[in-house]
Amino acid sequence: MSSVESSPISRYEDEVFPLSFSNVAFEPPMLSHSPDRSTYADDFSQSYQQELLTFPLSYPIVDESECTHTKDKTDSNIITSTEDDCMFDMEFNGNAASAVAAASKESNSASGFAFASNDAFANVAQQNYRLWLSSV
């Protein structure tokens, strides 16, 4: 008796859910039309690298009149050039000795300034935020 009851149900299931192994019967799913993940990642990284080459990240321009000179109490916070080279390995075409000297001179002059007012700090922070927002 159970075989008699199951036959109408199985016919109904075959009509509602036809079993087919051919690709001609159905259109491919929508996800098959999406871009390949690897090419999308490559395109994104190439556009990001091009953006960095075109608009390199820069330090905010600060007027020296808005800053006051402060004495450097300790050099422990300053990253040495060898640590910096290990963390940020980049292709460099030029004289490494002159680049290290220029970087140390720049870091010494930049670390010796503090903002004279909160408004000067807020202006630089707002400029950095706008730069970040334009890149997002």
Curated annotation (Swiss-Prot):
Any GO CC annotation of this UniProt entry: phagophore assembly site membrane
Domain of life: Eukaryota
Disruption phenotype: Reduces the autophagy flux induced by nitrogen starvation as well as the flux of the cytoplasm-to-vacuole targeting (cvt) pathway.
Ranges where the record places region ATG9-binding: 127-136
Example GO biological process: macroautophagy
Keywords attached to this entry: Autophagy, Membrane
Annotated compartments: Preautophagosomal structure membrane
Topological category with respect to the lipid bilayer: Peripheral membrane protein
Induction: Expression is dramatically increased under nitrogen starvation conditions and is regulated by the transcription factor GCN4.
Oligomeric form and interacting partners: Interacts with ATG9.
Role played: Involved in both selective and non-selective autophagy. Does not appear to play a role in determining the size of autophagosomes, but rather influences their formation rate. With ATG9, plays a role in the delivery of donor membrane to expanding phagophore.
Note: Present with 450 molecules/cell in log phase SD medium.
Domain comment quoted from the record: The C-terminal 10 residues are required for the association with ATG9.
Protein's UniProt name: Autophagy-related protein 41
Origin species: Saccharomyces cerevisiae (strain ATCC 204508 / S288c) (Baker's yeast)
